[in-house]
Amino acid sequence: MQCNFFGSLYVSKIKREDKKDHAALARSLAASTASPVIVPNYRLTAPDNELQHPAHAQDVLELLTSLLSWSGPRGGACQSLPCYDPNRMFLIGHSCGAHMLASILLDSSDPALVPPVELLRAVRGVVFAEGIYDIDALLMSFPTYRDWFIRDTFGDLPTYDRYSATKMTLREGTTHISWIIVHSGGDTLVDALQSQEMYHHLQSLHQGGPQGTGQVLKNWDDLKGDHSAILQSGKYIQIVRDFIHMVSSA
């Protein structure tokens, strides 16, 4: 089973992005991987709600936790659908979706984002694409993002170091999880430094572990499209499919 979390940069100032916007991608992923795909919504920060982190990630955690006891479509009967297995999850986070998943799967020191051990046990692999991980570094590259969405989402702070996924440690019970960090050379909204930092951080966390750094992969060469355009590319589907097949057959 795959759960896909697509980024809306946390905020909604013009158009509310919705899960239905990614229906075609979900169908392509399901067909390519022969597994169910779930694309959830989560609350967005808007001028009328003043919603701030970690509320968005809490929505994600609530959804993931509920999947552990969900019987699946049609009460769990596979029929013509791919079988739903809540004990075998692959999570896919794009843009801020990557930051939300990292804040849950890694130790963000936020009591509101502590996942149940059953969820951590169920996660087999994680795909991070065009992700945001280090907010201070992001603002160094894109200073206008502070006014666009960072201040509304995280507050007006002198530093956002405490929210940096590149500083978070492994949670107990996550050493079995495999990761792949994907970044397109054509992304104009999030620079490659974000993915480079996260890749090296995850490698350092897994150094000396049961599988070593071999369970932390990267793909920074195959995608050429812009930030969200890569989601419509066949190459992106192939990268996700190959990663899931590799982890599943290990």
What are these regions (language model features)?
Residues 131-170:
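Mobile cap/lid helix-loop segments that gate and shape the active-site cleft of serine hydrolases
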Residues 8, 95, 132, 185-186:
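Residue-level signal for short, function-critical loop segments
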Residues 120-124, 172-179:
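Short, proline-enriched alpha-helix->beta-strand connector loops that line the catalytic pocket
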Residues 50, 182, 189-250:
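C-terminal catalytic histidine-bearing segment of alpha/beta-hydrolase fold enzymes
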Residues 8, 41-48, 132, 225-226:
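Short beta-to-alpha linker loops that shape the active-site pocket of alpha/beta-hydrolase fold enzymes
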Residues 65-141:
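Primarily recognizes the serine-hydrolase "nucleophile elbow" in alpha/beta-hydrolase
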Residues 26-47:
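Conserved alpha/beta-hydrolase
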Residues 1-32:
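Short, surface-exposed "cap/lid" segments of acyl-processing enzymes
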